[in-house]
From Swiss-Prot:
Keywords carried by this UniProt record: Acetylation, Cadmium, Copper, Metal-binding, Metal-thiolate cluster, Phosphoprotein, Zinc
Organism for this UniProt entry: Homo sapiens (Human)
Descriptive protein name: Metallothionein-1F
Family in the record: Belongs to the metallothionein superfamily. Type 1 family.
GN (gene name): MT1F
Signal peptide: none
Modified residue annotations for Phosphoserine: S58
Region (Alpha): 30-61
Length: 61
């Protein structure tokens, strides 16, 4: 499996527990695209960069 979980937007896919999902655009992905974004953040797949897990992700505003 691609370590970045990359696939077409909206396509069903699964992410491994160790996956960072940096490129994941799948609606079925159970993990956030980055550590400080909530699961389901639609903007997260659009180049979100987090400074830290405890900080709010600006792209999710």
């Amino acid at each position: 499996m691609d370590p970045n979980c990359s696939c077409a937007a909206g396509v069903s896919c699964t992410c491994a527990g160790s996956c960072k999902c940096k490129e994941c655009k799948c609606t079925s992905c159970k993990k956030s695209c980055c550590s400080c974004c909530p699961v389901g953040c639609s903007k997260c797949a659009q180049g979100c960069v987090c400074k830290g897990a405890s900080e709010k992700c600006s792209c999710c505003d």
